[in-house]
């Protein structure tokens, strides 16, 4: 039921009294991005605490019952994130799963016959990390369907006390015995495994166990509790309206300067200028579907041609908590980034939605549909034939950069108007993602560039029909990353397949634990390969993998001879490369016009890297005397603005029909310059100036390789 999006139950205690042997406390078969948190259930003589678990469960404790959780697939077949849980006294098993796709972090199961049981005749994808089994008298885990390619089991750092048998294979009756009274299973892998991209995947069962003296308590410090409510200040009490019309910008800015914990009730809060938090600022929203921070379409602070500009920014090294809000940059705000996150390892973002997906609730020209129950506006960015020029006009929704890290839980970033749902760049600060869904983007769902020391649990990609050419995950110059329960899904409306779910460039020490690359049952168009490495031409063809390791030591599939004068294939897979340019060190740059990407071929290493991904169509490239990269773009002025990015009051802020064609858009050349080693932070618009200001230019560039129209240069 699509109406159950963002349903939630939290801060509740439930008790089933005697005489209810078939009773279960909660049936949690929600649609998407729903949660149960801070809930304690006493099942007693009843059947189960939770049946048909939803997408996210956190801080739950279940006592008694036949089962603590009894679940099938969540809707719509996503993985299930179970974080910080406690089970005790179940009569059959703490958890019973049938293709649940559970990702379990920090679970403690005590005084039960079985901790986790996979149902008979069913493959499953199970990942567990940092868990405790105590007094589990039959077996820790019951496995099944050993020969099925979809069986993917990975268990890491499972501490056991009084668990004589760690695992049992149901049909073969093979047993994995425990060691000593107290021991730790450091690694357990069961299913198709590839130790590198050069390996042919084979079904394995690997166990690494070591004795320990005692159980170490579970550390939940990376998901801190909110401050006490007595310490909160209600933004409404400071004068904020939240009506979708009034300008609440300065009230928010003043609140950040004065208060540490700002509570935001439901409402549509118009924020017209960037909001930057202090080191200790916490933003606490009531609900991510109804507590909206909105920048109206055509907002000058986020409009026009230029460097990324964030609605919300956290400071470097901050310990911020941001939760329960919806960041919405409307449809037309070319420079917009919803959130630029630079807070440190101790920071925390959870239960946050990023704009998009709800096409009927947008704003323009002072009009709004502030109440979701109001009739949708007659003017939207979408045309009658569902072709939208607004799509892919903004920067990334969530941008984690400049040493940003911390924990991110239960995030939904589904926005056709942004160039990617998640962009992580230039950070080796440890980070963790506990459940994130990325959907509906046109070119990229997620990009990691120069990132290290992150763990990503429950990464869910839903590539929609508008994203027929979308790369789900791009990893560029990354190392020491772990992905657990990686789901890449292409919907039934797809008309063709896509080359890869994961694309890598110059990466090493990347581990995928449980890879599920699939399409809807009604179609066969999924991603051809689960992973493709650009520079080695190596790929993981299998769609279902228990474990896949990218070591970074893989050799090229087709070695280069280094013979002078011989043409050889270096890299492939581009749509239409253009704009070749060379810097003083021999590095070569090129671009893809439609896909809006810029690449570098390093003269020393011979490796190709994706270096930039901005929402403008690059036409030609050049290098100046200081090796800055100059980019010529085909720029379409933002609706409501002139070509020079000044406001045009005679034009609406959404699409219009005019003499320039169906949409009345005119193409004009715009130029910017970047440093290739960090384009995002060095983006500089190059203004049009009078040549008389430069009597003796050092270098003159004529972009003769390709033009937009005959008269534009």
Regions inferred by a protein language model and the residue ranges of each:
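Sequence-structural signature of mature extracellular/luminal beta-sheet repeat domains
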Residues: 556-713
């Amino acid at each position: 039921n699509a109406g159950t999006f963002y349903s939630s139950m939290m801060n509740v205690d439930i008790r089933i009294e005697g005489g209810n042997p078939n009773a279960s406390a909660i049936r949690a078969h929600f649609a998407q991005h729903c949660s149960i948190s801070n809930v304690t259930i006493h099942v007693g003589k009843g059947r189960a605490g939770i049946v048909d678990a939803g997408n996210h469960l956190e801080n739950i404790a279940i006592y008694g019952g036949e089962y603590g959780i009894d679940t099938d697939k969540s809707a719509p077949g996503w993985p299930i994130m179970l974080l910080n849980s406690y089970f005790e006294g179940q009569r059959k098993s703490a958890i019973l799963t049938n293709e649940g796709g559970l990702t379990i972090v920090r679970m403690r199961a005590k005084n039960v016959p079985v901790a986790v049981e996979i149902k008979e005749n069913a493959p499953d994808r199970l990942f567990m990390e940092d868990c405790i089994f105590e007094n589990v008298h039959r077996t820790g885990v019951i496995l099944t369907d050993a020969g099925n390619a979809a069986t993917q089991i990975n268990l890491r750092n499972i501490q056991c006390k009084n668990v004589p048998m760690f695992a049992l294979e149901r049909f073969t009756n093979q047993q994995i015995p425990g060691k000593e009274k107290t021991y730790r299973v450091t690694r357990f892998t069961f299913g198709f495994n590839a130790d590198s991209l050069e390996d042919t995947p084979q079904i394995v069962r690997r166990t690494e166990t070591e004795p320990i003296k005692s159980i170490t308590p579970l550390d939940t410090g990376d998901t801190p509790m909110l401050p006490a409510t007595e310490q909160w200040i209600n933004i409404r009490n400071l004068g904020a309206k939240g009506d979708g019309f009034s300008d609440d910008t300065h009230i928010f800015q003043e609140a950040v300067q004065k208060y540490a914990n700002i509570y935001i009730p439901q409402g549509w809060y118009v924020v017209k200028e960037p909001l930057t938090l202090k080191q200790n600022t916490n933003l606490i929203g009531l609900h991510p579907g109804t507590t909206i921070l909105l920048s109206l379409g055509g907002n000058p602070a986020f409009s026009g041609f230029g460097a990324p500009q964030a609605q919300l920014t956290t400071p470097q090294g901050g310990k911020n908590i941001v939760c329960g809000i919806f960041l919405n940059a409307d449809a037309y705000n070319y420079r917009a980034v919803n959130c630029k996150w630079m807070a440190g390892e101790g920071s925390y973002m959870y239960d946050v939605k990023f704009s998009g997906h709800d096409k009927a609730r947008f704003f323009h020209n002072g009009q709004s549909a502030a109440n979701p129950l109001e009739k949708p506006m007659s003017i939207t960015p979408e045309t009658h034939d569902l072709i939208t020029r607004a799509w892919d006009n903004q920067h990334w929704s969530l941008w984690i950069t400049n040493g940003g890290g911390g924990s991110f839980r239960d995030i939904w970033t589904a926005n056709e108007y942004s160039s990617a749902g998640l962009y992580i760049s230039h950070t080796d600060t440890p980070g963790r993602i506990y459940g994130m869904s990325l959907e509906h983007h046109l070119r990229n769902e997620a990009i990691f560039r120069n990132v290290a020391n992150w763990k990503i649990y429950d990464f869910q990609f839903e590539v929609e029909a508008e994203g027929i050419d979308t790369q789900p995950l791009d990893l560029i110059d990354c190392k020491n990353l772990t992905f657990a329960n990686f789901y890449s899904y292409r919907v039934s409306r797809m008309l063709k397949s896509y080359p890869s779910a994961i694309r890598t460039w110059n990466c090493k020490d990347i581990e995928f634990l449980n890879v599920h690359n699939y399409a809807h049952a009604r179609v066969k168009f999924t991603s051809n390969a689960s992973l493709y490495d650009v520079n080695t031409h190596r790929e993981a063809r299998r769609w279902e993998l228990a474990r896949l390791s990218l070591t970074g030591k893989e050799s090229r599939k087709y070695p280069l001879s280094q013979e002078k004068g011989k043409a050889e294939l270096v890299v492939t897979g581009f749509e239409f490369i253009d704009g070749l340019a060379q810097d003083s060190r021999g590095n070569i740059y090129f671009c893809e016009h439609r896909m809006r990407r810029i690449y570098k071929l390093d003269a020393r290493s011979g490796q190709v890297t994706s270096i930039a991904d901005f929402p403008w169509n690059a036409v030609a490239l050049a290098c100046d005397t200081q090796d800055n990269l100059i980019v010529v773009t085909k720029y379409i002025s933002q609706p409501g603005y002139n070509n020079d990015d000044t406001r045009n009051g005679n034009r609406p802020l959404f699409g219009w029909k005019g003499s320039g064609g169906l949409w009345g858009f005119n193409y004009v050349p715009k130029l910017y310059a970047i440093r290739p080693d960090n384009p995002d932070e060095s983006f500089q618009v190059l203004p049009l100036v009078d040549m008389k200001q430069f009597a003796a230019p050092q270098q003159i560039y004529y972009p003769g390789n390709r033009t937009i129209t005959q008269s534009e240069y």
